[in-house]
Amino acid sequence: MDEERLSDNVRLYKGGSIRQGLRSFAAVYVLLALSFLLLTLLSSVSLARIAALSSKLSTLQSEPKHNFSSRDSLLFPCGAQSRQWEYFEGRCYYFSLSRMSWHKAKAECEEMHSHLIIIDSYAKQNFVMFRTRNERFWIGLTDENQEGEWQWVDGTDTRSSFTFWKEGEPNNRGFNEDCAHVWTSGQWNDVYCTYECYYVCEKPLPK
C-alpha cells in the first residue's frame, strides 16, 4: 500500500514538473516573440529616420552647389575653369600672353576646344582693337591653300564677308605672307606664318 502511494506521488510529481516546464517554455517563447517584434519595430523606425536625415542632408548639400553655380556663372560666364577668358556678345575670347607661330597658335586654340578668332563684324573688330592695341595678335585668317584667296579657319571666304585690312594689305611681300594678324593699329596685315606674335582664341559659351 505504501509502495503504491509512493508510486502515485512520483507520477504526480513528474506530471506537475512537465506541465510547469511547458508553461515556462511557453512564457519564454512569448517573451522571445515580443522581443523580436519590438526589435523589428525599432529597426523600421530607425531606418525611416535615417532615410529622412539622408534626404535632408542631400538637399542641404545640393543647395549650396546650386547657389555657387549660379553665382559663378554670373561672375565667369565663360566657365569657372575658364576665368582667363573674356566674354563679348555671347562668345568667349582668350588673349594669349605668349608669342608663337600661326600654326602653333591655331593648335593651342584647338587644344582649348576653340579656334583662332574669326572677325566678322565691326563690333568684334572694335572689341579686338581695344584689347590688342600696340601689340600684334594672330587671327584665324590665311591664304595658304590658294594665294590671294583668304579664308577664315571655318572655311568662310573673305570676299563675301567683313574685312579690315591695313591700307595696301594684303601684299604678300616676299611671296610668303600667308597668315594674317592684327597690326598695332588694330588693322589686319599679312605676314609669313612662322612669325611669332600673340594670338586670340574664340569659343562659344559653355552649355
Swiss-Prot record:
Transmembrane segments: 24-48
The keyword Transferase is annotated on this UniProt entry: no
Keyword Membrane applies: yes
Modification note: Some or all of the cysteines are involved in disulfide bonds.
Lipid bilayer topology: Single-pass type II membrane protein
Family annotation (SUPFAM superfamilies): C-type lectin-like
Modified residues (N-acetylmethionine): 1
Residues making up the signal peptide according to the UniProt record: none
UniProt GO MF annotations: carbohydrate binding; pattern recognition receptor activity
Gene Ontology biological-process annotations: endocytosis; immune response
Pfam families listed in its UniProt record: Lectin_C (PF00059)
Sugar-bearing residue positions: 67
Residue intervals on the Extracellular side: 49-207
Protein name: Hepatic lectin
The organism of origin for this protein: Gallus gallus
Lineage of the organism: Eukaryota, Metazoa, Chordata, Craniata, Vertebrata
